[in-house]
From Swiss-Prot:
Ways its activity is controlled: Requires 4 M NaCl or KCl for maximal activity.
Alphabetized Pfam families for the sequence: Glyco_hydro_42, Glyco_hydro_42M
GO molecular-function terms, A-Z: beta-galactosidase activity; metal ion binding
Entry function: Cleaves o-nitrophenyl-beta-D-galactopyranoside (ONPG) in vitro.
Protein name: Beta-galactosidase Bga
Known catalytic reactions: Hydrolysis of terminal non-reducing beta-D-galactose residues in beta-D-galactosides
Annotated spans, Disordered: 648-674
Temperature dependence: Optimum temperature is around 50-55 degrees Celsius in 4 M KCl and at pH 6.5. Partial activity (10-13% of maximum) at temperatures from 4-10 degrees Celsius.
Family: Belongs to the glycosyl hydrolase 42 family.
């Protein structure tokens, strides 16, 4: 496990580089990413190249025992190129052109831009093919950032028609597959089909799904262009890309097929503000949500089933969310350890030094604008010392898979049927319940081989093919345990309802059908009660009902046994909401509601019990554990102190006792005879051995 940083030598006088790079080495950093936005500096005018500054920076990094990770500089085409070839610019659905003046203003389907991309990538990779100090390359930067996966220009229109022709073969097949008889939307040829622009009413959902798939595929092709050229220059380099958090428009699994390792950019306190389901708590505003960040860690680790990188780790306050609270003391260390617990090989902080100009002046670095240490520098230096005491990176062995399906995400985004129905948030509800029991999770696409998992959670497989239904049936019949969420098996691969009861091809497997569904505003009572539990009018103590939200399905069991029934003042009262069916040697549970935390935890623990997966007592909110490489990580995303009474202090590989300002015996914890260990606010403990199912955590 290694640390690094993102550096922009082109922003600073060259006489300051030595001081900067020496301070990086002093902090124990090992990788330095550079040049992702440097095209205008590398080629200030067509055909005139200036590599001397980058040559010097790379050499300096190597002289200090570090390695450079270079980037193809295509995220920021220079002004002279935009003026020469204006057709490279993206267009919005209404025809508005995205002008020069920020970044990511190019179209992935522009033949002109692909030509220019090949030219600059060939030139920079050839330049450094023999450098011993360049470890690998990042392709471009954050594909799709600023809502740029989907473009609607003439080049995209032509490419979309070609993509459709390749997929469907003839126009009659497309019309039938989409169901274009609705509202007279039939096409006479592929040439008649345009990208979905402004319309009086909503677009055809099958057309929207097709455009989402096409747009993602366009990025896959563009990334492959970079990867092929990088490997042609030097096959020993690794190729990666820095994806983004909770990012819905790009299929990361498809892009990753052309990468050697997957990376992503993690900004926890920003994510809980601009892409979070609900209002962030004070602790989350200081440290983020471990499950929101953790699910992205697990998506990107699982994409290639190998250790991943965090290419940009938040170093302090950031400039782009609505507010920029300072992270909690030690949070920058916490985030690096949290990534390591989820399988990260390397964590690079963004950025080295707060910049003096441009759009990111209010984005912190590890160093302040004057070059002096900022808050994150001490955290980074401390973490590098701790990482050096831990063995090299190892594989994360996850007994549970969560199935994440971009096609279903796009289909549900087209027809959410409730203003707060968010596919990603629904995934996190189920994912968080498993992680809340300390169990490691792979987040995999529907095409993944599930045979190695003890249990599978599929929160919203909205689009289900016959092949997928058969594979799931075989998995369960062979002894697998599956938990489905609501809106599963509803549509075919083209985003059309089937002429059969839901959950469609999964009906026999589930052993029940969906009679009715409803989307519910928050003000309606939304609770269910476990079947067989005492009720309020019985002589026994009544078990409290548990809550759900947003979505409800009334289930009609056939072979399945009801597990939970609605406990509401309404027409669903008493109807089954959750059922379980036995198929061969395994079982499947279908949950017809969006579960709140107590119900999600109950479903997860039931699943883990049936699958024989060891798990912890339910963890406090904001506290997570993870097992990797013979060690257990405890990460505390809260301002509370944690006591772990069963843990022998001698078993600690990393703890909080060396943190500046932390006293493990402070305040109400001064009893030196107390058993166990203490983890401080926003703190970390790494324990030798696997203690997941024997761990008890108390907040103090």
């Amino acid at each position: 496990m290694r640390l690094g940083v993102c550096y922009f030598p082109e922003h600073w006088p060259s006489e300051e580089w030595e001081r900067d790079v020496a301070a990086m080495a002093d902090a124990g950093l090992e990788y330095v990413r550079m040049a992702e936005f440097s095209w205008g500096v590398l080629e200030p005018e067509r055909g005139t190249f200036d590599f001397e500054w980058l040559d010097e920076a790379i050499e300096l990094i190597g002289d200090h025992g570090m390695q450079a990770v270079l980037c193809t500089p295509t995220a920021t085409p220079p002004k002279w190129l935009v003026d020469e070839r204006p057709s490279i610019r993206q267009e919005d659905p209404d025809g508005t052109v995205r002008e020069h003046g920020s970044r990511r203003h190019y179209c992935f389907n522009s033949d002109a831009y692909r030509e220019e991309t090949a030219r600059i990538v060939e030139r920079v990779t050839e330049r450094y093919a023999d450098s011993p100090h360049v470890a690998g390359w990042q392709t471009d930067n954050e594909f799709g950032c600023h809502e740029t996966v989907r473009c609607y220009c003439d080049d995209c229109a032509d490419a979309f028609r070609t993509w459709l022709a390749d997929r469907y073969g003839d126009i009659d097949r497309l019309n039938e597959a989409w169901g274009n008889a609705f509202w007279s939307q039939q096409y006479g040829s592929f040439d008649e089909i345009d990208p979905p622009g402004p319309t009086p009413a909503e677009h055809h959902p099958s057309r929207l799904l097709a455009y989402a798939r096409f747009s993602s595929d366009s990025v896959v092709e563009y990334n492959r262009l970079h990867a092929d050229l990088i490997r042609e220059a030097d096959p020993d380099w690794f190729v990666t890309h820095n994806f983004m958090g909770r990012f819905p428009t790009l299929n990361a699994y498809d892009v990753s097929e052309d990468l050697d390792r997957v990376a992503w950019d993690s900004y926890p306190t920003g994510f809980v503000q601009d892409r979070y389901d609900g209002e962030a708590s004070p602790d989350q505003l200081r440290a983020g949500d471990p499950d929101q960040v953790g699910m992205d860690h697990d998506i990107y680790r699982s994409a290639l089933d190998r250790p991943f990188w965090v290419m940009e780790q938040q170093p302090g306050d950031v400039n782009w969310p609505p507010h920029c609270p300072q992270p909690g003391e030690g949070a920058m260390r916490l985030w690096a350890h949290h990534a390591a617990a989820h399988g990260a090989d390397a964590v690079l902080y963004f950025r080295w030094r707060r910049c003096l100009e441009g759009q990111e002046q209010y984005h912190a670095g590890l160093r302040k604008a004057d070059g002096s240490p900022d808050r994150g520098y001490a955290d980074a230096a401390h973490t590098s010392e701790e990482f050096a005491t831990l063995d090299g990176a190892s594989h994360v062995d996850a007994p549970v898979a969560v199935v994440f399906d971009y096609d279903s995400l796009w289909a549900l985004n087209a027809q959410p049927h409730a203003p707060d129905f968010d596919y990603w948030a629904l995934q996190e509800a189920f994912y968080g319940a498993v992680r809340g029991r300390g169990v490691q999770v792979d987040v995999v696409p529907p095409s993944a081989d599930l045979s190695g998992y003890a249990a599978v959670v599929a929160p919203a497989l909205h689009l289900v093919t016959e092949d997928l239904a058969d594979r799931l049936t075989d998995y369960i019949a062979g002894g697998g345990e599956v938990l489905f969420g609501p809106r599963t098996g509803v549509k075919d691969a083209e985003n059309k309802l089937r002429p059969m009861s839901q959950p469609g091809p999964l009906t026999d497997l589930v052993g029940a059908t969906v009679d009715q569904h409803e989307s519910l505003p928050r003000r309606l009572e939304t609770t269910v009660r476990r079947v067989g539990d005492p009720t309020d009018d019985s002589e026994e103590i009544a078990a409290p009902p548990v809550s759900f939200r947003t979505w409800a399905e009334w289930l009609d069991p056939d072979a399945a046994e009801p597990q939970y029934a609605y406990d509401v003042d309404g027409p669903a009262d008493g109807r089954p909401a959750v059922v379980t069916n036995t198929v061969g040697d395994g079982q499947v549970t279908y949950c017809g509601v969006w579960p709140e935390s107590d119900l999600a935890d109950a479903l997860a623990s039931d699943l883990l019990d049936r699958a024989g997966v060891r798990y912890a007592e339910r963890l406090p909110d904001g506290v997570r554990i993870g097992y990797r490489g013979g060690r257990t990580w405890v990460t505390n995303f809260t301002s509370d102190r944690l006591r772990l009474p069963e843990i022998d202090p001698e078993s600690l590989a990393v703890d909080d006792t060396d943190r500046d300002g932390f006293d493990p015996m402070a305040d109400d914890d001064k009893d030196s005879s107390a058993d166990g260990i203490v983890v401080g606010p926003y703190g970390v403990a790494v324990i030798e051995g696997d203690c997941v199912d024997g761990l008890r955590i108390a907040q103090t």
